[in-house]
């Protein structure tokens, strides 16, 4: 009976250790995914900033061109 108890405790202990290791690996994978998502959102944010600046420049150029045409038409 004592042998059976020791075997059972050993099996439970090893199962608990393996479960703990699996949970730790799962947490690490989730953290890596979160970091990848953060990196991707930063890249998107950087891309949108570039698009915004280009849009402003194009808008200003178009506005200046329209103003020049209007001023030429008035003269």
Curated annotation (Swiss-Prot):
GO CC terms: extracellular region
GO biological process, one term: defense response
Subcellular location: Secreted
Cleaved propeptide residues: 23-43, 74-75
Listed Acidic residues bias regions: 30-41
Main localization, broad class: secreted
Keyword field: Amidation, Amphibian defense peptide, Antimicrobial, Cleavage on pair of basic residues, Secreted, Signal
Pfam families: FSAP_sig_propep
Location of the region described as Disordered in the Swiss-Prot/TrEMBL record: 25-44
Leader peptide range in chain numbering: 1-22
Top-level taxon of origin: Eukaryota
Modified residues (Glutamine amide): 72
Tissues expressing this chain: Expressed by the skin glands.
Stated role: Has antimicrobial activity.
Family statement: Belongs to the frog skin active peptide (FSAP) family. Cruzioseptin subfamily.
Protein name as catalogued: Cruzioseptin-12
Species assigned in the record: Cruziohyla calcarifer
């Amino acid at each position: 009976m004592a042998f059976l108890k020791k075997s059972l405790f050993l099996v439970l202990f090893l199962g608990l250790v393996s479960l703990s290791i699996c949970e730790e690996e799962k947490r690490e994978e989730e953290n890596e995914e979160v970091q990848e998502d953060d990196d991707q959102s930063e890249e998107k944010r950087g891309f949108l900033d570039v698009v915004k600046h280009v849009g402003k420049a194009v808008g200003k150029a178009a506005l200046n061109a329209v103003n020049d045409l209007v001023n030429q038409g008035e003269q």
